[in-house]
Amino acid sequence: MSAYPRSYNPFDEDAEDEDARPAPWSDSRDLADGPGAPADRQQALRQEVLRRAEATAASTGRSLSLMYESERIGVVSAEELVRQRGALERTEKMVDKMEQDLKTSQKHINSIKSVFGGLVNYFRSKPAETPSAQNGTLTPQPSGRLKDAINSSKEQEAQYQASHPNLRKLQDSDSIPGGAGSAVSSEAYPRNPHLRACHQRIDSNLDELSVGLGRLKDIALGIQTEIDEQDDILDRLTSKVDKLDVSITSTERKVRQL
């Protein structure tokens, strides 16, 4: 027995399937052809260009913020290196003073071996006291490159005004990026005010990024120079401490022999 009624037509299912197929997908941005289609396409293109310009301006703004944050961290690290240099220099001065005092003690020990002659030698060869540098305020002197980089970063606003390419380009008309349009800015940027503002903001951000990255590079080079100089101080200090340790051992041996 057939599972379908006698009046059933199997080809009717194919017709129903074709009717049930989804309509082709169409983007809402697709514009129909017609008398106003070219103008609509131009308007859509303008909106797309403006959207991309705004996204680019926002991206350069975020990059600028990251650059400023990196520069701030670089300045903090550089200033910490300067304080560390001050500590190393004070330590070196103290080691020098200890070595001088130890030499004086050794002379006293040698003079004790001869009672009378020792007294004469003591008063005659007493070394002149040198002013103690660590008692005063010792101002650390960082490397010239690092000092210049720190000062440059702290004066970044004045430096930016002096080195901004757009300001030099537009100084004859006294215009600034994002300000009133001049003859130069009208030629350099689009006529659409919103698009022109985006382009000016992008140019301003890129120019400031260029100057800021230059400052950041100077900070990095200054930090490297400062680290190299502090390595020299550490090597010098290590040698002095080793020499002082030998002198202390020798002095202790002489004291026990008295």
Curated annotation (Swiss-Prot):
Residue positions, PTM Phosphothreonine: T130, T137
Keyword tags: Autophagy, Cell membrane, Cell projection, Cilium, Cilium biogenesis/degradation, Coiled coil, Cytoplasm, Cytoplasmic vesicle, Golgi apparatus, Membrane, Phosphoprotein, Protein transport, Transport
CDD domains: SNARE_SNAP29C, SNARE_SNAP29N
Alphabetical list of SMART domains matching this protein: t_SNARE
Modified residues (Phosphoserine): S65, S77, S114, S163, S182, S185, S204, S210
Membrane topology: Peripheral membrane protein
Entry annotated with the keyword Cell wall biogenesis/degradation: no
GO biological process: autophagosome maturation; autophagosome membrane docking; cilium assembly; exocytosis; protein transport; synaptic vesicle fusion to presynaptic active zone membrane; synaptic vesicle priming
Name of the protein described by the UniProt record: Synaptosomal-associated protein 29
Organism, as annotated: Bos taurus
